[in-house]
UniProtKB/Swiss-Prot annotation:
Region Disordered: start-end pairs: 1-21
SUPFAM superfamilies membership: Ribosomal L27 protein-like (SSF110324)
Family: Belongs to the bacterial ribosomal protein bL27 family.
Classification via HAMAP family: Ribosomal_bL27 (MF_00539)
GO annotations of cellular component type: cytosolic large ribosomal subunit
GO biological process, one term: translation
Keywords, comma-separated and alphabetical: Ribonucleoprotein, Ribosomal protein
The protein's name in its UniProt record: Large ribosomal subunit protein bL27
Gene name for this UniProt entry: rpmA
Length: 85
């Protein structure tokens, strides 16, 4: 007979890497073209004037300028704009 009980195993021990999502540049900040404004899953924020969208829904500036956020339309979509400097 065994003198000690078996140690057993655990089903824990896994965790995914952080994805660093969220707003990176806030309203009023001055940014350069190509700067990431928002990293997101899906379109919580929609691209507005002078803002591009990547295949992972990242919003980025197309021109140098100042960031502004707005709520538009009957569906209250949150949009991000960059006014050229």
């Amino acid at each position: 007979m065994a003198q000690k009980k078996g140690g057993g195993s655990t089903r824990n021990g896994r965790d995914s890497q952080p994805k660093m999502l969220g707003v990176k540049k806030f309203g009023g900040e001055v940014i350069n073209a190509g700067s990431i404004i928002v990293r997101q899953r899906g379109t919580q924020f929609h691209p507005g004037v002078n803002v591009g969208i990547g295949k992972d829904h990242t919003l980025y500036a197309l021109v140098d300028g100042q960031v502004s956020f707005a709520i538009k339309g009957s569906m209250n979509k949150r949009t991000v704009n960059v006014t050229a400097a």
